[in-house]
A protein has these predicted regions:
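Amphipathic protein-protein interaction modules
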Residues: 63-107
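Short, compact, well-ordered microdomains
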Residues: 94-97, 101-131
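N-terminal, charge-rich interaction modules
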Residues: 1-72
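Mature, function-bearing regions of proteins
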Residues: 25-30, 71-74, 82-85, 89, ...
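A general structural signal for short secondary-structure junctions and capping/turn motifs
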Residues: 38-39, 90, 110-113
């Protein structure tokens, strides 16, 4: 899994929260995002996508799966913002997704597994730092 971890780390996770756009990186603090989260009363966050399940390209089904994920988020009434995961090298298509706020991480993990995902990115308002949460143990 080292190559997959390297790919996650070589990605910028863009979050469009209201009028703000935040560029998040695995393992890197983001004081502006942390400050925004605290102003909104948000304590934790996670980025999830429905694209390319199992880390295999699936362009033809990505749009439909993203809509289905958005419906699941609405059913839970989770606060969220649009996100886009962009590989730094441009060697993987951008993946639309969502940054979900203050949801139970275990529930998000199960949701991501249901969409065939390998991992999600989670963090807290403490410093806005995102970390990879691998889902293969579920």
């Amino acid at each position: 899994m080292p190559a997959l971890e390297a790919a996650f780390r070589a990605t910028t996770y863009h979050v469009a929260a209201g009028r703000e756009l935040f560029d998040l990186r695995i393992g890197e603090a983001n004081p502006a995002f942390s400050s925004w989260l605290k102003r909104q009363g948000i304590s934790n966050w996670a980025i999830i996508t429905a694209c390319n399940p199992g880390s295999k390209l699936a362009q033809e089904q990505n749009a439909a799966e993203t809509r289905r994920l958005q419906e699941k988020i609405a059913q839970h009434a989770w606060r969220h913002a649009p996100a886009r995961n962009c590989a730094d090298a441009g060697d993987w298509p951008d993946e639309p997704g969502f940054c979900i706020f203050d949801a139970d991480e275990n529930v998000l993990r199960m949701l991501a597994v249901a969409f065939g995902q390998t991992a999600i990115v989670c963090g807290s308002a403490d410093d806005g730092r995102g970390e990879i949460v691998w889902l293969n143990a579920l």
